[in-house]
Amino acid sequence: MAKLTKDELIEAFKEMTLIELSEFVKEFEEVFDVEAAAPVAAVAAGAPAAGGAAEEEKTEFDVVLTDAGAKKIGVIKAVREIVSGLGLKEAKELVEGAPKAILEGASKDDAEAAKAKLEEAGASVELK
């Protein structure tokens, strides 16, 4: 197998959907026995020393679909509206594979809007 350059890898990642990238990261973590979130956890562990302001400073949120509920079709439609460029098959797999992250690193307003839309469709959602 030919060795890919960093630029070639970046170009390949640009063509992937968020779901494909998420699955890639999970498989990468399993194969190499590493955690991509380890540095973030170390930073978050140091934050409480600054006082109780850590909650106020959080600017990025993950929207996690915990349960699709009884109305899966409505939830699939909502997921497709929230995640641009997502096909019907990918949205269905995402909903059926709950719990799954729908949005990662979203602003507070975007995360709350996505949560409201998913809950309106009948899903159970968490913001992390």
Swiss-Prot record:
Keyword Ribonucleoprotein: yes
Subunit structure: Homodimer. Part of the ribosomal stalk of the 50S ribosomal subunit. Forms a multimeric L10(L12)X complex, where L10 forms an elongated spine to which 2 to 4 L12 dimers bind in a sequential fashion. Binds GTP-bound translation factors.
Family according to the record: Belongs to the bacterial ribosomal protein bL12 family.
GO terms (BP aspect): translation
HAMAP family reported in the protein's UniProt record: Ribosomal_bL12
PANTHER family found in the cross-reference section: 39S RIBOSOMAL PROTEIN L12, LARGE RIBOSOMAL SUBUNIT PROTEIN BL12M
Annotated function: Forms part of the ribosomal stalk which helps the ribosome interact with GTP-bound translation factors. Is thus essential for accurate translation.
Alphabetized UniProt keyword annotations: Ribonucleoprotein, Ribosomal protein
Disulfide bonds: none
Organism: Corynebacterium aurimucosum (strain ATCC 700975 / DSM 44827 / CIP 107346 / CN-1) (Corynebacterium nigricans)
InterPro entries referenced in this protein's UniProt entry, alphabetically: Ribosomal_bL12, Ribosomal_bL12_C, Ribosomal_bL12_C/ClpS-like, Ribosomal_bL12_oligo, Ribosomal_bL12_oligo_N_sf
Single GO MF annotation: mRNA binding
Keyword Ribosomal protein set for record: yes
Entry GO terms, CC: cytosolic large ribosomal subunit
CDD domains: Ribosomal_L7_L12
Designated name of the protein: Large ribosomal subunit protein bL12
